[in-house]
UniProtKB/Swiss-Prot annotation:
One of its GO terms (cellular component) is nucleus. Probable core component of cullin-based SCF-like E3 ubiquitin-protein ligase complexes which mediate the ubiquitination and subsequent proteasomal degradation of target proteins. The E3 ubiquitin-protein ligase activity of the complex is dependent on the neddylation of the cullin subunit. Involved in ER-Golgi transport by regulating the size of COPII coats, thereby playing a key role in collagen export, which is required for embryonic stem (ES) cells division. May play a role in the regulation of mittotic entry via ubiquitination of aurka. Its main location: nucleus. GO terms for biological process: cell migration; COPII vesicle coating; embryonic cleavage; endoplasmic reticulum to Golgi vesicle-mediated transport; integrin-mediated signaling pathway; mitotic metaphase chromosome alignment; negative regulation of Rho protein signal transduction; positive regulation of mitotic cell cycle phase transition. Neddylated. Attachment of NEDD8 is required for the E3 ubiquitin-protein ligase activity of the SCF-like complex. There is a cross-link at residue 712 (Glycyl lysine isopeptide (Lys-Gly) (interchain with G-Cter in NEDD8)). One of its GO terms (molecular function) is ubiquitin protein ligase binding. This is Cullin-3-A. PANTHER family: CULLIN (PTHR11932). Residues 682-698 have a biased composition (Basic and acidic residues). It comes from Xenopus laevis (African clawed frog). It is found in: Nucleus.
Length: 768
């Protein structure tokens, strides 16, 4: 037991010692290993590597590094590679400068890469240990650096390589076939020699390539511009861009695509934008004039590539559009047809909407420019609101031929686009009210649904305040229909006779309808006057405290008319009559649809054959302006509506002119509508002035109401801020001028709604 214990204890005290591996090698032995490796490297460079044992070479390199001779190995490698590249490779490349240069260089590069891969495999342990510990380039990269510095960047080789590549690309641009593979290999070599950077490729090739390209494209642009139209030029530039992109893809490094495309864009587009756009007989205006949507789309696509390209296009388009618009809305020459006027604007809008969709990709800048231009020229003509209302009036009247409800709806939607551009929406509202009243009172609306649909569009655009009176007009019409049913029932019950007059009365609420403040006088003939008095008594008995005032200018009548005279041709021979009801050999009966004023004039001729202008004026008491218009319609209108004749036969109505019934009148129609002269041409100048005065009066109240609303809320405001807020609130209806707003502020100060602050007269306070 004791022996075992001693033995155990003895084993415990004993320590094993491993002798360290000797880290030193005989210098002679080291040199022999290096000579072996050096010879192997040289054989690899000479492509005589078939007899080499890579395993043995790897072990030798491993041994040198392990025994701290890595530096000798690394330095020796650098010297051997450098010597080979200088003495063999560089010489071969220099000898080929004038013969197969690029192929020789590419072959040398490929051989060098192959050799360095093999050498790297042999010296793998040095890469893992010595290179890491000493923070030096690995074997493969060392080979790249030496090749870069001693071959590729060697004086004349570097220059010759750059020039060769540039010459080949220049030749290809001119249409020659070149060795794209050689270019691609050279560019790839330059990229690899940058050691994961672009510096070598960029400095030795890309920078001079871009400079050379800029000069080439500069010359090309001058040639293209001199020889081609705008559309052909654009196509050539597009082709050039695609060609350069394709060349980068197949020959150069992909990173060159962006800079070379920018050079093309700068030299072929940016520097010549104005010239391209303004080319005579082929530029932007020519394309717009001739509806060249595809060419415009090409120009848009090309110009969208460069800064301010689309802005340049927009400015040119805007000048042309404004010129076209101003020509359409010019106030030169009276008698412009409102329907044609608005249709012309709608056609122009449709054209540019088509360009916007098909050519300009619905681009926001173009959209805003077109809208701004339409707003500009539409508001140049003060008649635009009236004409737009007349246009809508024309589309909502009965008898619009060739249009379906959907087509009318589409036209009205387009009209609403113009309405949005209109600054004086309150003026439009006033005219729309007049024209709607005329349609409703003469039963000319195509349908209540169409009318209400249009009002709904206006309501959506401007709010219920804008349309409340229009909706009130419809309510009045509905109530009037009920009232007339009750009146007819009353006549049946009481047996009261209207003396052969078929009377229809519309009772209108003063605030809703465009009634005139001073109702024009008119001596209504006894028969219709008697019929109306019966209705008046009936109505006031039901609604005590109300007043009924006849609005003669809004009324209409159907008259039974008989013409007795023969109808003659210009040679004096008599002709037969069609369309009229013939009761005797030459007697013809028609129903004449006329205004109240026209009815009053015509019924005078039941008493006498002839009347002078003064006599008619005295008998009817119609205001002179209305009387002249009515007589012009009856005696100077179309031959198929000329129921009176006048002496002398002129279009003007003046004192002393004599009027008689035109017994030779005939028409193919039994019912003859006597059009009011210039009714479709809008208001006369005096009427327009009167309307404008009413609008200005309404605006005063609206501006004051807005000022009071704002000041009541804010209590205290500086003048300019208040003016800006008032403008903002009212711009949906009209644009008040700062001068007018200032006058209304002063008016409110005088009436003590507002007051100026003592310390600053440009600051106002609200007086509760």
């Amino acid at each position: 037991m004791s022996n075992l214990g001693k033995s155990t204890g003895s084993r415990k005290d004993t320590k094993m010692r491993i002798r360290a591996f000797p880290m030193t090698m005989d210098e002679k032995y080291v040199n022999s290993i290096w000579d072996l490796l050096k010879n192997a490297i040289q054989e690899i460079q000479r492509k005589n590597n078939s007899g080499l044992s890579f395993e043995e070479l790897y072990r030798n390199a491993y041994t040198m590094v392990l025994h701290k001779h890595g530096e000798k190995l690394y330095t020796g490698l650098r010297e051997v590679v450098t010597e080979h590249l200088i003495n063999k490779v560089r010489e071969d490349v220099l000898n080929s400068l004038n013969n197969n240069f690029l192929q020789t260089l590419n072959q040398a590069w490929n051989d060098h890469q192959t050799a360095m891969v093999m050498i790297r495999d042999i010296l793998m342990y040095m890469d893992r240990v010595y290179v890491q510990q000493n923070n030096v380039e690995n074997v493969y990269n060392l080979g790249l650096i030496i090749f870069r510095d001693q071959v590729v960047r060697y004086g004349c080789i570097r220059d010759h390589l750059r020039q060769t590549l540039l010459d080949m690309i220049a030749r290809e641009r001119k249409g020659e076939v070149v060795d794209r593979g050689a270019i691609r290999n050279a560019c790839q070599m330059l990229m690899i020699l940058g050691l994961e950077g672009r510096s070598v490729y960029e400095e030795d090739f890309e920078a001079p390539f871009l400079e050379m390209s800029a000069e080439f494209f500069q010359m090309e642009s001058q040639k293209f511009l001199a020889e081609n139209s705008a559309s052909v030029y654009i196509k050539k530039v597009e082709a050039r861009i695609n060609e350069e992109i394709e060349r980068v893809m197949h020959c150069l490094d992909k990173s060159t695509e962006e800079p070379i495309v920018k050079v093309v864009e700068r030299e072929l587009i940016s520097k010549h934008m104005k010239t391209i756009v303004e080319m005579e007989n082929s530029g932007l205006v020519h394309m717009l004039k001739n509806g060249k949507t595809e060419d415009l789309a090409c120009m848009y696509k090309l110009f969208s590539r460069v800064p301010n390209g689309l802005k340049t296009m927009c400015e040119c388009m805007s000048l042309y559009l404004r010129e076209q618009g101003k020509a359409l809305v010019s106030e030169e020459g009276e008698g412009k047809n409102p329907v044609d006027y608005i249709q012309g604007l709608l056609d122009l809008k449709s054209r540019f909407d088509r360009f916007l969709q098909e050519s300009f990709s619905n681009d926001r800048l173009f959209k805003q420019t077109i809208a701004g231009d339409f707003e500009y020229f539409l508001n140049l003509n003060s008649r635009s609101p009236e004409y737009l209302s007349l246009f809508i009036d024309d589309k909502l009247k009965k008898g619009v031929k060739g249009l379906t409800e959907q087509e009318v709806e589409s036209i009205l939607d387009k009209a609403m686009v113009l309405f949005r551009f209109m600054q004086e929406k309150d003026v439009f509202e006033r005219y729309y009210k007049q024209h709607l009243a005329r349609r409703l009172l003469t039963n000319k609306s195509v349908s209540d649904d169409s009318e209400k649909n249009m009002i709904s569009k206006l309501k959506t655009e401007c709010g219920c305040q804008f349309t409340s009176k229009l909706e009130g007009m419809f309510r009045d019409m509905s109530i009037s229909n009920t009232t007339m049913d009750e009146f007819r029932q009353h006549l049946q019950t009481t047996g009261v006779s209207l003396g052969g007059v078929d009377l229809t009365v519309r009772v209108l609420t003063t605030g809703y309808w465009p009634t005139q403040s001073a109702t024009p006088k008119c001596n209504i003939p006894p028969a219709p006057r008697h019929a109306f008095e019966i209705f008046r008594r009936f109505y006031l008995a039901k609604h005590s405290g109300r007043q009924l005032t006849l609005q003669h200018h809004m009324g209409s009548a159907d008259l039974n008319a008989t013409f007795y005279g023969p109808v003659k041709k210009e040679d004096g021979s008599e002709v037969g009559v069609g369309g009229a009801q013939v009761t005797g050999s030459n007697t013809r009966k028609h129903i004449l649809q006329v205004s109240t004023f026209q009815m009053t004039i015509l019924m005078l001729f039941n008493n006498r054959d002839k009347y002078t202008f003064e006599e008619i004026q005295q008998e009817t008491d119609i205001p002179e302006r209305e009387l002249v218009r009515a007589l012009q319609s009856l005696a100077c209108g179309k031959p198929t509506q000329r129921v009176l004749t006048k002496e002398p036969k002129s279009k003007e109505i003046e004192s002393g002119h004599m009027f008689t019934v035109n017994d030779q009148f005939t028409s193919k129609l039994h019912r003859v509508k006597i059009q009011t002269v210039a009714a479709k041409q809008g208001e006369s100048d005096p009427e327009r002035k009167e309307t404008r005065q009413k609008v200005d009066d309404d605006r005063k109240h609206e501006i004051e109401a807005a000022i009071v609303r704002i000041m009541k809320s804010r209590k205290k405001m500086q003048h300019n801020v208040l003016v800006a807020e008032v403008t903002q609130q009212l711009k949906a209806r009209f644009l008040p001028s700062p001068v007018v707003i200032k006058k209304r502020i002063e008016g409110l100060i005088e009436r003590e709604y507002l007051a100026r602050t003592p310390e600053d007269r440009k600051v106002y306070t609200y007086v509760a």
